[in-house]
Amino acid sequence: MRNFFLIPIFATLMLLFVSNDGNAQAKKASTIQVIQFHSEHRCMTCNKIEELARVALKKYPAIPFSLVNADDKKNEKQCTQFQAYGSSLFLYNTKTKKIKNLTEMAFMNAGDQDKFIKEFNKNLDTFLKS
């Protein structure tokens, strides 16, 4: 009989711990952004990188994706901050200001969706933990 009362209490406590961990993950993810810089005239590969990054980010709905036109003068400060003067892909932590350049990975794997998503997610998971 005593176990009958302890089981619901234990289950409730477990749910609280699990939901708190999920909130911590969401808070961490909300400080991360994925930013793709591009020039005015975009090539097929640049468009494909955008498409694949958006597909990969479906696993992380709290992480925003943004496109920045590197040729637009209003984006000059941001381009300088990231040293992005053409097509490039970055992970950015708004809290720590840490930047991870994924440009080489993106261009190397743009032709293979599965490999791109695997490498992108691996990099993003590592970035989230740092």
Predicted regions and their residues:
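Local sequence-structure signature of Cys/Sec-based thiol-disulfide redox active-site neighborhoods
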Residues: 27-57
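Thiol-based oxidoreductase modules, predominantly thioredoxin-like and allied folds used
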Residues: 62-75
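Sec/Tat signal peptide C-region and signal peptidase I cleavage site
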Residues: 20-24
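Structural micro-motif
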Residues: 79-92
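Non-catalytic, surface beta->alpha helical segment in thiol-disulfide oxidoreductase systems
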Residues: 91-130
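Positively charged n-region of N-terminal signal peptides that target proteins for export
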Residues: 1-6
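Bacterial N-terminal signal peptides
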Residues: 7-17
